[in-house]
């Protein structure tokens, strides 16, 4: 699942559902046969381009898979269903190993500061699309201009960045996260680690002229690419997976609902709330701000604009659905939340579960401050995540074997046995 055909898409649930309906007829064997071809920014009709909406859960993974399996069998649409579950797997993998995210986030600024003058010049050329490497420069400009790259192009770009330009993978991952409309902390960080040989230890991805020429239908034939891809060394041993998160008990009675950019389909959380006897009497949205920014550079204006519009759409829908006043808070801060809760005379706040990443980091820091003011912040863990994430203890292929059973638990599609 990748982003928009060209330009900036509408960050609304309505637009995401329209894109889903348009793609569903092509989600079967046609997708499997054509998905690896990158025809360029003017024609991405062979992929779904749904990921910006799924990243913010304007449209949920469950809805996407359910719509596809209402039209196609799992056998026919298996490759696309796997792509949806890849995103779930990456989130689960990082959820069980949050220290990997913490180390990455802390490494970006030092990696930039450690660049020599020639390396800094190479870095500046790479992000500006002026290295002289055919294809690579085009992808850099496409990313900045549209917030999109075909998944295959992302792999080639990362490989050239690491092995041909010999730049730190962390700076490449940061460049992507700041510019991709679908920039997801787990998928992005772990995909770059995979190319570098850190995710599947010792296994790297080498971009070749022949593969790029073939999969771009002759648009690009870059010269001078690295002939080898030695794995990047990591001085931190990979920790064993920790426990998966569990649904926490919710407070009964009157609550306020706080939305953030990681999950903006509050309507589908109603069954969890109803089961706990919860009444939503106020809704607010708050952004983690420059949550994807780093000391390397700020977040792309395209990304910032898409996120702002997505929050507004999610807030309006939630307010209408729960019949509650909806507000936009001035940031995901303790003071803003405290004032909002006080205005509605509530001490219990519910919020969609934020997976490991910048929003989660911000919420975790808020817990103590809010508790000291007598405010309880409870996370709503979706069944999709609760069922899937515990299986992300190893590589994707063992996880993939669980997909039929997970679909049965979700009661999606035809019997996938």
Each language-model region and where it sits:
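Long, low-complexity intrinsically disordered regions
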Residues: 97-125, 195-196, 205-214
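C-terminal, helix-dominated tail/subdomain
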Residues: 180-235
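Helix-hairpin-helix/helix-loop-helix acidic hairpins
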Residues: 120-144
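Structured ligand/cofactor/substrate-binding pocket environments in proteins
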Residues: 76-92, 136-195, 200-204
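Amphipathic, well-ordered alpha-helical segments in soluble domains
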Residues: 60, 64, 132-135, 152
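Flexible, active-site-adjacent loop/turn segments at secondary-structure boundaries
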Residues: 51-52, 56, 121-124, 147, ...
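Trp/Phe/Arg-rich N-terminal binding region typifying the photolyase-homology
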Residues: 2-82, 86, 91-92, 96-115, ...
